[in-house]
């Protein structure tokens, strides 16, 4: 799988821009503010249906324009397809595959990407929600059933919480048995898939981390269920916990049990890297996890996703960059990388961007 062509019309600061990346490494060079990250953002948007920089699609549309479009041509199994995202200011967005309208849930998994940006440090330092989203997006790109179940689960949690709020207003007892069953079934499946994914990543990530650093450190990933030594995948366990917590949940109008409360923990030589790792160790750990995510997607689908590296030159030292480039070249992974110094491209193709 690889990107053949990207065209942006009225996106961010770009009026009409087309690039044709190489199958290997393409380095997007230019001064700050010229629009390098906008290209990475558009490719990622074509993959998952949203930006990694903003929750407001109006921010994507060029100032002064009423609409903007992203057109991405990708090749999979020797067949080319065209994804189009059309955004209209104040009216939302629409997705198309080969000119046929599709929904966002149908977009996920068509063209797969893995993203690494300077903000990725939040994957270790940030709130549990960031780590859950990372894991959910990874699995959703390879499993439509997982994404559907995740949507249904989140709706059931919202309905249960709404029933508690309504009961507080009416003075009546909340009827949540139906939502408890939906939540329990969804939770059991979601946690099972998460555990399977974490186990597969955990087999790869120590080897990748050692490859990048050349050191004999051991990086590992653990799935953490609040208050439990081990995560549970049984429907009956979730039903029991929801019942036991119902009185407290009713008072607080929230649901305190389930995968929406779980977390990931990253350990370096058995110690929590968020607390004990240096910033350099944390950045290398995140990159190792991103590469293990790529290996997981290849294992599940048969092909690597496209790797998007934004401003990687500021994140890694020369030795780690060289190790990364060697790995990407060896595995023949299409990579788009941004930076201000074209010398970082090595043997890759350079696309020069300029301020207008």
Report each predicted region and the residues it spans.
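Nucleotide-state sensing region of NTPase/ATPase domains
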Residues: 47-124, 128-130, 139-142, 146, ...
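C-terminal lobe/lid and adjacent interdomain/linker elements of RecA-like ASCE P-loop ATPase modules
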Residues: 78-79, 86-90, 319-356
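Helix-to-loop junction immediately C-terminal to a conserved catalytic motif
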Residues: 44
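Conserved NTPase motor "head" modules and their coupling/switch loops across ABC/AAA+ ATPases, GTPases
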Residues: 1-31, 170-306, 315-319, 323-334, ...
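Conserved lysine of the Walker
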Residues: 36
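Long, charged N-terminal accessory/stalk domains
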Residues: 122-123, 130-170, 174-177, 181
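Walker B catalytic acidic pair
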Residues: 310-312
